[in-house]
Amino acid sequence: HIIDLDNGIRFRDTEEGKANEYENNGYDPEKAKQLFEEALAETGIDKVSLTMIYNDSGVQVTTSEFLQQNWPKVLGEDKFELKLQSMPSSQRGDQMRNFANDPTCYEISWGGWDSTDLMPWNAFKYWTTYYSAKNEPFYSEEFDTVFDDANFGADRFEEGVRLNEVAEMEKMLIEPAIIIPVTQNEYK
């Protein structure tokens, strides 16, 4: 995503964009296990079983199967289970869109979105509380405020404003693990 069109600067090439990048793309099995153990202790449960819904074709099949095999190895096979439920893309989409009416309609799934490379701030609309096709449980007035400032704020065209807001929105989603970024650019 280009954050500075005049100078051709990509968001990831800025200090702000690099701040949300983690060594080994954030893959840290020891930290994952530690945080998982803390979550189990905090909630008073000893095992988690999740069902992932995914498209029955394409890369989601192999990636979902990989996660099913590897997450229990990282988190503890006696403490974590990932069940898989494949379905046609349209059915999965319908099920996810039903979230507003039935928050228990799915537990974990792949999400896909696209955005123009020239407006990275707009790519975050999917996590606003008011997005019309919302299909996940993240609601944050603070996030909405930052998104609105990046898109509609009086100072949005001032140097560095959108850069900081994009970095802030990204951090607000990644740090609490609202999303686990997996990128695939099919157009390049």
Where are these regions (language model features)?
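Solvent-exposed loop/turn segments at secondary-structure junctions
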Residues: 56-60, 89-90, 113-118, 187-188
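Short helices/loops that flank or line small-molecule/ion binding pockets
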Residues: 65-76, 90-106
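Short beta-strand/turn micro-motifs at beta-sheet edges
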Residues: 39-42, 109, 135-136
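Paired acidic/hydrophobic, glycine-rich loop segments that form the ligand-binding mouth/hinge
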Residues: 103-111, 181
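Append "and occasionally in soluble cytosolic enzymes with long acidic Gly/Pro-rich linkers
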Residues: 1-73, 168
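Extracellular/periplasmic catalytic domains that process cell-envelope and extracellular macromolecules
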Residues: 43-46, 100-104, 141, 173-175
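Extracytoplasmic/peripheral linker and loop segments enriched in polar/acidic and small residues
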Residues: 1, 16-28, 78-94, 120-188
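Short, well-ordered beta-strand segments
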Residues: 51-53, 109, 183
